UniProtKB/Swiss-Prot annotation:
The keyword Nuclease does not apply. Residues 2-119 form the MTTase N-terminal domain. Residues 147-379 form the Radical SAM core domain. PROSITE patterns: MTTASE_N (PS51449), MTTASE_RADICAL (PS01278), RADICAL_SAM (PS51918), TRAM (PS50926). This is tRNA-2-methylthio-N(6)-dimethylallyladenosine synthase. Monomer. The lineage of its organism: Bacteria, Pseudomonadati, Pseudomonadota, Gammaproteobacteria, Candidatus Pseudothioglobaceae. Binds 2 [4Fe-4S] clusters. One cluster is coordinated with 3 cysteines and an exchangeable S-adenosyl-L-methionine. Keywords: 4Fe-4S, Cytoplasm, Iron, Iron-sulfur, Metal-binding, S-adenosyl-L-methionine, Transferase, tRNA processing. One of its GO terms (molecular function) is 4 iron, 4 sulfur cluster binding. It is an enzyme of class 2 (transferase). It comes from Ruthia magnifica subsp. Calyptogena magnifica. [4Fe-4S] cluster 1 binds at C11, C48, C82.
Length: 444
């Protein structure tokens, strides 16, 4: 039996893509996933270019795999994802032993690319197979039906981003925004529900820009998609990520009132609490607009958990800009954040800006942001002690007599119960809260 090993860096979209890669190659070549790279026949690296040192991580991993290839000349090594899309030729220059290079939009072509390597044209030397083109949404037309044994699943509803924020590489590596047809998404959710999935997380780089074509020629927005997906038998909870504030519409806010299955958690990145920095980032909105949207949402869902991304030390960020960010963190009471020190992404507009914030200052500011939000996380978790929370039971916990699930606001929750409860939403009386974790007792 031929084996496939996939190493995934980056976001949920990459995780989704890696799952699809496994499905595609199992369907076409009978490759079976393994957790042991040394035993695999095909090694694939699905890369992310969002953060600094993406290339270094890539070549460090490839260096390890080269040792395996030195021992087994038939081993096939492939690189996909956003770094592959951005740096395809460079990868071959530095790692000529790589056999396949593919982009986020061409993973569906992996079977033919693999065949090119496995069965080269007679009389021709074996050459690497490269395809980092942007065939828009075509990849979704050539994927096998989804398969999963989990009660949660990601569903990609769109690709790319057209915002061109000055710091972001995504439009250059995944292309412009392209939405999947409405019925295709709904059918995928239906198939997953039949397989036992109870929670779907709708994915997109800018998911609330979704504009799915319906059979009648009309366009469905994210709010309508959520509404219809919630009506599918078996689906008990819906999430979506990642959103952009400029397209967090009133119809989407109303969905929190109309769709009880829509989880009380929103990841809405703002990146900075300074209007000046938001302008330099070309985010397209001001802080007051962001706060207004959150205020409207909390009128409908007072207990909703809000998380964000923050870029610390963006070029031009002075002390007042940073204090504005800290003020916003206090005012919103962010539950969680993905916070990073700014690093220039080659090819973006911001890479031409003078990076004028001292690294020690960046580190100090990042530490303060993380400390403040960690305190918020702890405070919210402790405030949940004594409450009854609806938990989607996902699996058996490491302690075998315990089950594991998550609250609507993404708290990992452990409690004693029978594994027959997996896939159900149960009521749990919370007895302990620490960090992002809760402990509780099952209410019969």
């Amino acid at each position: 039996m031929k084996k496939l090993y996939i190493r995934t860096f980056g976001c949920q979209m990459n995780e989704y893509d890696s799952n699809k890669i496994a499905d595609v190659l199992n369907h076409s070549h009978g490759l079976v996933l393994t957790d042991d790279a040394a035993s695999a026949n095909v090694l694939l690296l699905n890369t992310c270019s969002i953060r600094e040192k993406a290339q270094e991580k890539l070549f460090h991993q490839l260096g390890r795999w080269r040792k395996l290839k030195d021992k087994n000349s038939n081993l096939i090594i492939g690189v996909g994802g956003c770094v592959a899309s951005q740096e395809g030729e460079l990868i071959l220059e530095r790692a000529p032993y790589v056999d396949i290079i593919f982009g986020p939009q061409t993973l569906h072509r992996l079977p033919s690319m693999l065949n090119e390597v496995l069965t080269p044209t007679p009389g021709m030397s074996v050459k690497p197979s490269i395809d980092i083109s942007f065939p828009e949404i075509e990849k979704f037309d050539h994927l096998p039906k989804p398969k999963t044994s989990s009660v949660t699943a990601f569903v990609s509803i769109m690709e790319g981003c057209s915002k061109y924020c000055t710091f972001c590489i995504v439009p250059y590596t995944r292309g412009e925004e392209v939405s999947r047809p409405f019925i295709d998404v709904i059918n995928e959710v239906k198939i997953l529900a039949i397989q036992g999935v109870r929670e779907v997380n709708l994915l997109g780089q800018n998911v609330n820009a979704y504009q799915g074509l319906m059979d009648d020629g009309e366009i469905a927005d994210l709010a309508l998609l959520i509404n219809i997906a919630a009506q599918i038998d078996g689906i008990k909870r819906i999430r979506y990520t990642t959103s952009h504030p400029t397209q967090f519409s009133d119809s989407l806010i109303e969905a929190y009132m109309e769709v009880p299955k829509l989880a009380s958690h929103l990841h809405l990145p703002i990146q900075s609490g300074s209007d000046k920095i938001l302008r330099l980032m070309k985010r397209g909105h001001m802080v007051i607009e962001y706060k207004s949207k959150i205020r409207k949402l909390r009128k409908i869902r007072p207990d909703i958990s809000i998380s964000s991304d923050f870029i610390i030390g963006f070029p031009g960020e002075n002390e007042q800009d940073f204090l504005d960010t800290m003020t916003l963190i206090d005012e919103i009471g962010f539950d969680k954040s993905f916070s990073f020190i700014y690093s220039a992404r080659p090819g973006t507009l911001a890479s031409s800006y003078l990076d004028d914030v001292d690294m020690d200052v960046k580190k100090q500011r990042l530490a303060l942001v993380q400390k403040t939000i960690d305190k918020n996380t702890e405070r919210i978790s402790k405030s949940m002690v004594g409450s009854v929370q609806k938990i989607l039971v996902e699996n058996v916990a490491k302690k075998r007599d315990n089950l594991f699930g998550r609250t609507e606001n993404m708290r990992n929750t452990h409690f004693k119960g029978d594994k027959s409860l997996i896939g159900q939403i149960v009521n749990i009386k919370i007895t302990q809260g620490r960090g992002n974790s809760l402990v509780g007792n099952l209410i019969a």
